Amino acid sequence: MRSAVLVLVALAVVACKGSDGGSGTGSPGGGSGGGTSAVGTGSGAQPDPSADDQSRFDQERQPNEIVASLGLKPGMVVADVGAGTGLLTVHVARAVFPGGHVVATDIDAAVLDYLSARMEAAGFDSIVEARQVSPTDPGLEPNTYDLILLAQVDHYFDDRVAWLTKAAPALRAGGRLAISNRMQNRAPAFAAAESVGFHVVTEVNDVPGQFVALFELNP
């Protein structure tokens, strides 16, 4: 059971990241979603997957539009990188249910506690695995994933090209890389992906000021 101090630190980290999201290698907890709440004030404080956090995220970030552009289907295996507290992860899990699996990664173990609580509350704890990874290692098994999702997180990587080079072997044949971010991060994201050997398949700009691009590895 985590101390109140640890909970408050996690909350402070997430609050600082609220404007950008994303954990990657720079800031922990919140690429796909970073809101948190806590129950209690003493040493027994517990993660609380607040419905208010989810509602606010859904309104501001329009995750249904993002997920709809990913082409997810039941049974798919997805890596949600820099998943934070799971505000987007819950939508991804819903899209691959039943039969699918989501590995939600982050560099912050405390933030992943909130993600696990959110998945349990939503009924997706059986298909979502919270996984702590290092800042420079994707921590993904080779030849496993139908989709690797980077949602407002790649701009935190110290070296996009190095990270993508390590992540690419985790994709199955025909698997895709999805990058969703604000428009000011589009050019470096595309440049990094293309330098690793990806080419863009589709790009959607349904959410104002944001892009969602799907990439596949060159033959």
Feature map (PLM): residue ranges:
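C-terminal motif of bacterial Sec signal peptides marking the signal peptidase cleavage site
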Residues: 13-15
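Bacterial signal peptide processing site
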Residues: 17-20
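Conserved class I S-adenosyl-L-methionine
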Residues: 75-84
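A short glycine-rich, Lys/Arg-flanked "PGG" loop and its adjoining helix->strand segment in the class I
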Residues: 93-94, 161-176
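Conserved SAM/SAH-binding beta-strand->alpha-helix loop
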Residues: 108-110
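Conserved SAM-binding strand-loop segment of SAM-dependent methyltransferases
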Residues: 123-136
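A short acidic, Gly/Pro-enriched loop at the edge of an enzyme's catalytic core
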Residues: 136-148
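A short SAM/SAH-binding and catalytic strip from SAM-dependent methyltransferases
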Residues: 145-160
